[in-house]
Amino acid sequence: MKAIAYYTSLPINDPNALQDIELPAPVAGPRDLLVEVKAISVNPVDTKVRQNVAPENGAAKVLGWDVAGVVKAVGSEVTLFKAGDKVFYAGSLVRPGGNSELHTVDERIVGHMPKSLGFAEAAALPLTAITAWELLFERLQVREGKQDEGQSLLIVGAAGGVGSILTQLASQLTALKVIGTASRPETQEWAKALGADLVIDHSQPLSEALKNAGQAQVTHVASLTQTDHHLDQLVDALQPQGKLALIDDPKTLDVSKLKRKSLSLHWEFMYTRSMFETTDMIEQHNLLNRVAELIDAGTLKTTVGEHFGVINATNLRRAHALLESGKAKGKIVLEGF
Protein backbone atom coordinates (compact mmCIF):
# COMPACT_ATOMS: atom_id res chain seq x y z
CA MET A 1 0.00 0.00 0.00
CA LYS A 2 1.03 3.63 -0.49
CA ALA A 3 2.09 5.52 2.64
CA ILE A 4 3.88 8.72 3.61
CA ALA A 5 6.56 8.33 6.27
CA TYR A 6 9.91 9.53 7.58
CA TYR A 7 13.09 7.71 8.62
CA THR A 8 14.82 10.50 10.53
CA SER A 9 13.73 13.84 12.03
CA LEU A 10 14.52 16.57 9.49
CA PRO A 11 13.46 20.20 8.85
CA ILE A 12 10.30 20.30 6.76
CA ASN A 13 12.07 22.03 3.83
CA ASP A 14 14.21 18.88 3.39
CA PRO A 15 12.70 16.64 0.65
CA ASN A 16 13.32 13.60 2.88
CA ALA A 17 11.40 15.07 5.84
CA LEU A 18 8.37 13.13 4.54
CA GLN A 19 8.63 10.52 1.79
CA ASP A 20 6.29 8.50 -0.43
CA ILE A 21 6.88 4.80 0.30
CA GLU A 22 5.27 1.36 -0.09
CA LEU A 23 4.40 -0.71 2.99
CA PRO A 24 2.71 -4.10 3.52
CA ALA A 25 -1.04 -3.81 4.21
CA PRO A 26 -1.83 -4.01 7.95
CA VAL A 27 -3.87 -6.85 9.46
CA ALA A 28 -6.77 -6.09 11.81
CA GLY A 29 -6.54 -7.36 15.40
CA PRO A 30 -9.60 -8.72 17.27
CA ARG A 31 -11.07 -5.28 18.18
CA ASP A 32 -9.72 -3.52 15.07
CA LEU A 33 -11.27 -2.12 11.94
CA LEU A 34 -9.30 -2.24 8.68
CA VAL A 35 -10.09 1.14 7.11
CA GLU A 36 -9.60 2.32 3.53
CA VAL A 37 -8.38 5.87 4.13
CA LYS A 38 -10.24 8.43 2.01
CA ALA A 39 -9.14 11.71 3.63
CA ILE A 40 -6.87 12.94 6.42
CA SER A 41 -6.28 16.16 8.33
CA VAL A 42 -3.00 17.54 9.67
CA ASN A 43 -2.53 18.67 13.28
CA PRO A 44 0.26 20.24 15.36
CA VAL A 45 0.86 16.79 16.88
CA ASP A 46 2.09 15.62 13.44
CA THR A 47 4.79 18.27 13.32
CA LYS A 48 5.78 17.72 16.98
CA VAL A 49 6.19 13.97 16.51
CA ARG A 50 8.10 14.40 13.23
CA GLN A 51 10.50 16.88 14.83
CA ASN A 52 11.05 15.06 18.13
CA VAL A 53 10.43 11.31 17.74
CA ALA A 54 13.06 9.33 15.85
CA PRO A 55 11.79 6.08 14.27
CA GLU A 56 13.11 2.92 15.94
CA ASN A 57 15.84 0.85 14.26
CA GLY A 58 15.62 2.70 10.96
CA ALA A 59 11.97 1.77 10.44
CA ALA A 60 9.57 4.05 8.58
CA LYS A 61 7.30 6.09 10.86
CA VAL A 62 3.85 6.98 9.52
CA LEU A 63 2.08 10.04 10.96
CA GLY A 64 -1.55 11.14 10.68
CA TRP A 65 -4.15 11.30 13.44
CA ASP A 66 -7.33 12.48 11.75
CA VAL A 67 -8.90 10.02 9.33
CA ALA A 68 -12.15 9.58 7.42
CA GLY A 69 -12.67 6.42 5.41
CA VAL A 70 -14.59 3.21 4.75
CA VAL A 71 -14.40 -0.03 6.75
CA LYS A 72 -13.00 -2.81 4.54
CA ALA A 73 -12.86 -5.59 7.15
CA VAL A 74 -13.40 -6.10 10.88
CA GLY A 75 -11.63 -8.12 13.57
CA SER A 76 -13.14 -11.20 15.19
CA GLU A 77 -14.42 -9.35 18.28
CA VAL A 78 -15.79 -6.19 16.59
CA THR A 79 -19.43 -5.40 17.44
CA LEU A 80 -19.86 -1.70 16.62
CA PHE A 81 -19.14 -1.62 12.85
CA LYS A 82 -19.37 -3.68 9.68
CA ALA A 83 -17.66 -3.62 6.28
CA GLY A 84 -18.86 -0.69 4.18
CA ASP A 85 -19.48 1.69 7.11
CA LYS A 86 -18.16 5.24 6.69
CA VAL A 87 -16.11 6.21 9.75
CA PHE A 88 -14.02 9.01 11.25
CA TYR A 89 -11.49 8.93 14.09
CA ALA A 90 -8.24 10.34 15.54
CA GLY A 91 -6.47 7.03 16.18
CA SER A 92 -3.76 6.32 18.75
CA LEU A 93 -0.28 7.76 19.25
CA VAL A 94 1.10 4.33 20.17
CA ARG A 95 0.13 2.83 16.80
CA PRO A 96 1.06 3.84 13.21
CA GLY A 97 -0.74 6.94 11.93
CA GLY A 98 -3.27 7.09 9.13
CA ASN A 99 -1.24 8.64 6.29
CA SER A 100 -1.56 5.41 4.30
CA GLU A 101 -4.06 3.77 1.95
CA LEU A 102 -5.08 1.24 4.63
CA HIS A 103 -5.11 1.67 8.41
CA THR A 104 -6.09 -0.37 11.46
CA VAL A 105 -7.77 1.21 14.49
CA ASP A 106 -9.54 -0.01 17.64
CA GLU A 107 -13.32 0.25 17.13
CA ARG A 108 -13.77 1.82 20.60
CA ILE A 109 -12.23 5.13 19.44
CA VAL A 110 -14.06 5.32 16.08
CA GLY A 111 -17.32 7.08 15.21
CA HIS A 112 -19.85 6.75 12.40
CA MET A 113 -19.13 9.60 9.97
CA PRO A 114 -21.65 12.46 9.72
CA LYS A 115 -24.07 11.68 6.89
CA SER A 116 -24.11 15.29 5.70
CA LEU A 117 -20.33 15.62 5.17
CA GLY A 118 -17.87 14.44 2.56
CA PHE A 119 -14.70 12.61 3.60
CA ALA A 120 -12.45 15.71 3.63
CA GLU A 121 -14.87 17.73 5.77
CA ALA A 122 -15.26 14.82 8.19
CA ALA A 123 -11.50 14.27 8.49
CA ALA A 124 -11.13 17.79 9.90
CA LEU A 125 -13.17 16.93 12.99
CA PRO A 126 -12.10 14.00 15.20
CA LEU A 127 -9.00 15.18 17.08
CA THR A 128 -10.27 18.68 17.79
CA ALA A 129 -13.81 17.51 18.57
CA ILE A 130 -12.64 14.85 21.04
CA THR A 131 -10.28 17.33 22.73
CA ALA A 132 -12.92 20.06 22.99
CA TRP A 133 -15.64 17.67 24.23
CA GLU A 134 -13.46 16.02 26.87
CA LEU A 135 -12.12 19.37 28.08
CA LEU A 136 -15.57 20.95 28.43
CA PHE A 137 -17.73 18.12 29.73
CA GLU A 138 -15.23 15.83 31.47
CA ARG A 139 -12.30 17.96 32.71
CA LEU A 140 -14.23 21.18 33.51
CA GLN A 141 -17.40 19.15 34.26
CA VAL A 142 -19.69 21.69 32.60
CA ARG A 143 -23.21 20.32 32.19
CA GLU A 144 -25.37 20.41 29.08
CA GLY A 145 -28.55 22.47 29.18
CA LYS A 146 -29.38 25.33 31.54
CA GLN A 147 -27.80 23.98 34.75
CA ASP A 148 -24.73 26.25 34.66
CA GLU A 149 -26.60 29.49 34.02
CA GLY A 150 -24.73 32.49 35.40
CA GLN A 151 -21.32 30.86 34.88
CA SER A 152 -18.78 31.83 32.24
CA LEU A 153 -15.98 30.34 30.14
CA LEU A 154 -12.91 32.16 28.81
CA ILE A 155 -11.42 30.35 25.79
CA VAL A 156 -7.83 31.45 25.08
CA GLY A 157 -7.29 30.78 21.38
CA ALA A 158 -10.95 30.56 20.38
CA ALA A 159 -10.28 30.69 16.62
CA GLY A 160 -7.84 27.76 16.47
CA GLY A 161 -8.66 24.13 15.69
CA VAL A 162 -9.78 23.08 19.18
CA GLY A 163 -11.09 26.56 20.01
CA SER A 164 -13.36 26.59 16.96
CA ILE A 165 -15.13 23.41 18.13
CA LEU A 166 -15.06 24.32 21.83
CA THR A 167 -16.68 27.70 21.14
CA GLN A 168 -19.51 25.97 19.28
CA LEU A 169 -20.03 23.26 21.92
CA ALA A 170 -20.10 25.75 24.80
CA SER A 171 -22.40 28.24 23.05
CA GLN A 172 -24.79 25.65 21.56
CA LEU A 173 -25.04 23.02 24.31
CA THR A 174 -24.53 24.88 27.61
CA ALA A 175 -25.77 27.97 29.44
CA LEU A 176 -22.25 29.40 29.88
CA LYS A 177 -21.43 32.90 28.76
CA VAL A 178 -18.61 32.30 26.25
CA ILE A 179 -15.74 34.77 25.99
CA GLY A 180 -13.20 33.98 23.27
CA THR A 181 -9.77 35.45 22.65
CA ALA A 182 -8.23 36.06 19.23
CA SER A 183 -5.55 38.49 18.07
CA ARG A 184 -6.48 39.46 14.49
CA PRO A 185 -9.67 41.09 13.16
CA GLU A 186 -10.47 38.11 10.88
CA THR A 187 -10.00 35.54 13.66
CA GLN A 188 -12.05 37.68 16.05
CA GLU A 189 -14.90 37.70 13.51
CA TRP A 190 -14.50 33.91 13.08
CA ALA A 191 -14.88 33.38 16.86
CA LYS A 192 -17.98 35.59 16.93
CA ALA A 193 -19.50 33.68 14.01
CA LEU A 194 -18.96 30.41 15.90
CA GLY A 195 -21.04 31.67 18.81
CA ALA A 196 -18.78 33.54 21.25
CA ASP A 197 -20.79 36.10 23.25
CA LEU A 198 -17.73 38.32 23.55
CA VAL A 199 -14.31 38.32 21.86
CA ILE A 200 -11.22 40.02 23.30
CA ASP A 201 -7.69 40.50 21.95
CA HIS A 202 -5.22 38.09 23.60
CA SER A 203 -2.25 40.22 22.54
CA GLN A 204 -3.42 42.56 25.35
CA PRO A 205 -3.40 41.67 29.10
CA LEU A 206 -6.40 39.34 29.42
CA SER A 207 -7.67 40.38 32.85
CA GLU A 208 -7.66 44.06 31.78
CA ALA A 209 -9.36 43.27 28.46
CA LEU A 210 -12.06 41.33 30.33
CA LYS A 211 -12.69 44.22 32.73
CA ASN A 212 -12.82 46.70 29.84
CA ALA A 213 -15.43 44.48 28.17
CA GLY A 214 -17.56 44.48 31.32
CA GLN A 215 -16.69 40.95 32.47
CA ALA A 216 -14.80 41.26 35.76
CA GLN A 217 -14.05 37.55 36.22
CA VAL A 218 -14.97 34.11 34.87
CA THR A 219 -15.73 30.75 36.50
CA HIS A 220 -13.92 28.56 33.92
CA VAL A 221 -10.89 28.99 31.65
CA ALA A 222 -9.86 26.82 28.70
CA SER A 223 -6.27 27.74 27.88
CA LEU A 224 -5.45 26.34 24.45
CA THR A 225 -2.20 28.20 23.76
CA GLN A 226 0.69 29.88 25.61
CA THR A 227 -0.57 28.91 29.07
CA ASP A 228 2.77 29.71 30.72
CA HIS A 229 2.77 33.18 29.13
CA HIS A 230 -0.81 33.95 30.22
CA LEU A 231 -0.86 32.18 33.62
CA ASP A 232 -0.79 35.28 35.86
CA GLN A 233 -3.57 36.86 33.79
CA LEU A 234 -5.65 33.68 33.92
CA VAL A 235 -5.34 33.48 37.71
CA ASP A 236 -6.45 37.13 37.93
CA ALA A 237 -9.37 36.47 35.57
CA LEU A 238 -10.71 33.45 37.46
CA GLN A 239 -13.15 33.71 40.33
CA PRO A 240 -12.13 32.04 43.61
CA GLN A 241 -12.67 28.26 43.35
CA GLY A 242 -12.71 28.49 39.57
CA LYS A 243 -11.42 25.86 37.13
CA LEU A 244 -8.50 26.11 34.69
CA ALA A 245 -8.07 23.53 31.90
CA LEU A 246 -5.22 23.45 29.40
CA ILE A 247 -4.11 21.39 26.39
CA ASP A 248 -0.72 22.85 25.46
CA ASP A 249 2.82 21.92 26.56
CA PRO A 250 4.28 24.66 28.78
CA LYS A 251 7.92 24.04 29.70
CA THR A 252 7.14 24.91 33.32
CA LEU A 253 3.97 25.92 35.15
CA ASP A 254 4.04 27.41 38.64
CA VAL A 255 0.87 25.87 40.08
CA SER A 256 1.46 27.50 43.48
CA LYS A 257 -0.13 30.61 41.94
CA LEU A 258 -3.48 28.77 41.98
CA LYS A 259 -3.45 28.15 45.73
CA ARG A 260 -4.73 31.46 47.15
CA LYS A 261 -7.95 31.23 45.12
CA SER A 262 -8.24 27.42 45.49
CA LEU A 263 -8.28 27.10 41.70
CA SER A 264 -8.34 23.60 40.24
CA LEU A 265 -6.11 22.57 37.32
CA HIS A 266 -7.23 20.11 34.64
CA TRP A 267 -5.08 18.77 31.81
CA GLU A 268 -6.77 17.46 28.67
CA PHE A 269 -4.90 15.03 26.40
CA MET A 270 -7.22 13.15 24.09
CA TYR A 271 -4.76 10.26 23.57
CA THR A 272 -4.80 9.19 27.23
CA ARG A 273 -7.66 6.73 26.71
CA SER A 274 -6.14 4.95 23.71
CA MET A 275 -2.57 5.12 25.04
CA PHE A 276 -3.48 3.37 28.30
CA GLU A 277 -6.53 1.46 26.99
CA THR A 278 -8.60 2.82 29.86
CA THR A 279 -11.79 1.02 30.87
CA ASP A 280 -13.85 3.93 29.50
CA MET A 281 -12.08 4.03 26.12
CA ILE A 282 -15.43 3.51 24.35
CA GLU A 283 -16.50 7.01 25.45
CA GLN A 284 -14.60 8.36 22.43
CA HIS A 285 -16.78 6.20 20.16
CA ASN A 286 -19.87 7.56 21.91
CA LEU A 287 -18.84 11.21 21.74
CA LEU A 288 -17.83 11.00 18.06
CA ASN A 289 -21.28 9.57 17.27
CA ARG A 290 -22.83 12.46 19.20
CA VAL A 291 -20.68 14.98 17.31
CA ALA A 292 -21.83 13.41 14.02
CA GLU A 293 -25.47 13.82 15.09
CA LEU A 294 -24.84 17.48 16.01
CA ILE A 295 -23.17 18.09 12.63
CA ASP A 296 -26.09 16.48 10.77
CA ALA A 297 -28.58 18.54 12.80
CA GLY A 298 -26.74 21.76 11.86
CA THR A 299 -25.84 22.48 15.50
CA LEU A 300 -22.09 22.20 14.83
CA LYS A 301 -20.14 22.95 11.67
CA THR A 302 -16.85 21.54 10.44
CA THR A 303 -13.77 23.76 10.50
CA VAL A 304 -11.97 23.02 7.22
CA GLY A 305 -9.60 25.85 6.36
CA GLU A 306 -7.71 24.62 3.30
CA HIS A 307 -7.82 21.57 0.99
CA PHE A 308 -4.24 20.68 0.00
CA GLY A 309 -5.10 18.09 -2.67
CA VAL A 310 -4.18 14.41 -2.77
CA ILE A 311 -2.41 12.59 0.07
CA ASN A 312 1.28 12.50 -0.88
CA ALA A 313 4.62 13.57 0.57
CA THR A 314 4.83 16.84 -1.37
CA ASN A 315 1.42 18.05 -0.19
CA LEU A 316 2.00 16.86 3.38
CA ARG A 317 5.31 18.75 3.53
CA ARG A 318 3.42 21.88 2.43
CA ALA A 319 0.82 21.27 5.16
CA HIS A 320 3.46 20.76 7.86
CA ALA A 321 5.26 23.94 6.74
CA LEU A 322 2.07 26.00 7.02
CA LEU A 323 1.30 24.60 10.48
CA GLU A 324 4.86 25.31 11.64
CA SER A 325 4.53 28.92 10.40
CA GLY A 326 1.63 29.47 12.80
CA LYS A 327 -0.45 31.01 9.98
CA ALA A 328 -2.94 28.20 9.37
CA LYS A 329 -6.62 29.13 9.84
CA GLY A 330 -8.94 26.19 10.30
CA LYS A 331 -7.95 22.60 9.52
CA ILE A 332 -5.79 21.51 6.56
CA VAL A 333 -7.23 18.45 4.79
CA LEU A 334 -5.95 16.12 2.06
CA GLU A 335 -8.00 13.57 0.10
CA GLY A 336 -7.31 10.49 -2.03
CA PHE A 337 -4.07 8.79 -3.06
Report each predicted region and the residues it spans.
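Mid-domain Rossmann-like dinucleotide-binding core that forms the NAD(H)/NADP(H) cofactor-binding site
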Residues: L125-Q204
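Short, glycine/polar-rich helix-capping loops at beta-to-alpha or helix-loop-helix junctions
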Residues: G98-N99, S183-W190, T252-V255
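Residue-level marker of beta-strand positions
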Residues: D85-K86, L102, S152, K243
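C-terminal capping/lid region of NAD(P)-dependent oxidoreductase domains
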Residues: E293-E306, R317-F337
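Glycine-rich beta-strand-centered segment in the early N-terminal region that forms part
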Residues: P24-S41, Q51-V94
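C-terminal substrate-binding/catalytic core of Rossmann-like NAD(P)-dependent dehydrogenases/reductases
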Residues: K257-H307
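A structural motif shared across PLP-dependent enzymes of the aminotransferase-like
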Residues: V94-E107
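Glycine-rich cofactor phosphate-binding loops and adjacent beta1-alpha1 units
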Residues: E144-K146, L198-E268
